[in-house]
């Protein structure tokens, strides 16, 4: 692909992803607030919130199949069109079953967008700029988690125009997606796709995918239960909620410098391996300090900052690594596995940590965190030393 076309493609992917995600993260809390205003139970609202993630998890293994059948450019168009259409559906109907179906479809499209955008950014970045571009992309995605809800608050969640603003952002994402230039044909059109392709990718890079799991566990999963952790420490509700911001700040600050540093190694593969080992070790050290937090509660802030930064950095380095090794449909398969392992790590952290915070906050909870961090560090260290990546 010519340099100018690659630059246009990268800019269009960044812009379309940014607008689509801002719209999505405005829309989800808006829908939940409307459901509560309609006296729909909290349990049903929670199930609705989980439906989007279910769509991501269920559809992600088939992203490579869509890319192979439609082409990567058309797959990105589809990933932008479905959320835009779904957002209009939320405007014109209040039927709860329809809302669930639309949210499932929007989640599936988000999974396709997640996989395709990251794979294309990795493949079409120049080798000396791949880490920077991936780090910048991950940082941009992280800002949408904050910007979407903040814009909703500014516009007013009870304003009738709020739905239309969500739709406008998503339509803007679709418009930018249409500006993505034609992409070269995948270098591996006969690559395995679907579940078989995902399984092969997992077998090819098991330790990289473990890094994705640990990244999801500490960046996204633990973050989701930090308010409960703060309350267990005796913090008030406001300070407990701010722990989430500390984790998000760590993630936002660290991903771009991590990507830029990964570009500077003469031996890129060895450099990435070494950085993963260091980041995993920092995560382990932070978890070992957790038992000291109860009597010294201010330690919680730097610890959760490190968890967010380390988790985001592990995911970023894993994406840079597979983007440096693979292309085409094979890269889409590997990206799909990385997304799945990251999501699985997040789900495992949320479920297990919530239980342990209730039954054993001073022993079981830190022990679980230390065990996950230790397994990740040992696996990455052994893989680096044996050059098994």
Residue ranges and their predicted role:
Residues 59-71, 156, 254-270, 357:
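Helix-to-loop junctions at the C-terminal end of transmembrane segments
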Residues 167-188, 379-383:
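C-terminal membrane-cytosol helix-exit motif in multi-pass small-molecule transporters
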Residues 329-357:
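A late C-terminal transmembrane helix in Major Facilitator Superfamily
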Residues 104-139:
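Cytoplasmic helix-loop-helix junction between adjacent transmembrane helices
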Residues 75-88, 273-288, 370:
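Structural signature of the two symmetry-related core transmembrane helices
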Residues 5-53, 207-211, 220-229, 233, ...:
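Helix-loop boundary and gating motifs at the non-cytosolic
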Residues 50-63, 245-257:
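Central cavity-lining transmembrane alpha-helices of secondary-active solute carriers
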Residues 112-125, 312-326:
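Intracellular juxtamembrane helix-capping segments at the cytosolic ends
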